Amino acid sequence: MKTTGLFAAVATPIDNDGRFDEPTFDRLVAFLLAAGVDGICIGGATGEYPHFEVAERIAVIHRAAAQLPPDRTLLVGIGSSSVRRTLALGEASMSAGARALLLPMPMFFRYQQDDLRAFAGHVSRTLRAPCLLYDLPDFTNGIAPETTLALLRDEEFVIGIKDSSGRIENVRRFADARQGHDWTLLVGDDRLLSAGLEAGWDGGISGVACCCPELLAALAASCRQGDAADTLRLQQRLEELVARLTPFPTPWGIRIALAARGLPTGPLPLPITSAREQHIAEFQTWLRGWLEHVAV
């Protein structure tokens, strides 16, 4: 079962008490769908999954499923601090109608590649649900390409990967290794989106699409149409935005950008210093001007 398209990784709005803000979430999802994304992905790094309890995350899953029309796709990240919680999230996601699950590797503690292979195999076989490996080495144990390919070949329910490693060499390696296999290859690093699509990958899950979905949807469409000049132009615009987002902690820049666009997602998770306040103000001023001159 291949999953194709451009998916927005969704931030998790909260109120001033840190509770899931359902009305703002609904507005955010409507904003993303109106911009033309093929679906949404919740529960990933952009959604700040380590901050939320399982019950809170299940509430987000059900809210997302209720907002999506039949022609859009729901993907759900099920990373957590334990196998037990990961399995609970996977069961809830599939019951709610998710098309596939994003399975990040364990966070915080370091493991060997054999441990990661055992983990992914156990979770996917227990859930008996389509799982996309989620390589997120900045925040979890990284998956070696050899481990990824072994899991794709050997595990029935490991159907693909969202590669957020940023390793350009993986783009061609995984595309070449597919060789007729029905694997789903999704770009997870926005800087490599056009490179992945041009190499035959099936789409992308984009954090930047959460705050600028029209740009990412246009870039994906341009790649599909084979318009090399427009693809290059839009990728350059995307890289301009990524360069401005990168100095912020993940995913602060995306949430700050949403606020500048009239979709505030609640307080940031740490106290804000005066220097950070100035940085935020400068970025939001830049963003408003940049948006006025970005033709998609």
What are the residue ranges of the model-derived segments?
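C-terminal alpha-helical cap/extension of soluble enzyme domains
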Residues: 2, 7-11, 31, 35-37, ...
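Active-site beta->alpha loop and helix N-cap motifs at the rims of alpha/beta catalytic domains
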Residues: 2-140
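Short, flexible micro-motifs
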Residues: 8, 21, 42, 46-50, ...
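Short, amphipathic alpha-helical "lid/cap" segments that border enzyme active or binding sites
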Residues: 22-29, 117, 145, 277-287
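A general structural signal for well-ordered alpha-helical segments in protein cores
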Residues: 25, 57, 61, 86, ...
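Alpha-helical structural signal in soluble globular domains
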Residues: 35, 59, 63-68, 92, ...
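Secondary-structure boundary/capping signal
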Residues: 72-73, 131, 159, 182, ...
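Catalytic alpha/beta core domains of metabolic enzymes, predominantly
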Residues: 125, 138-246
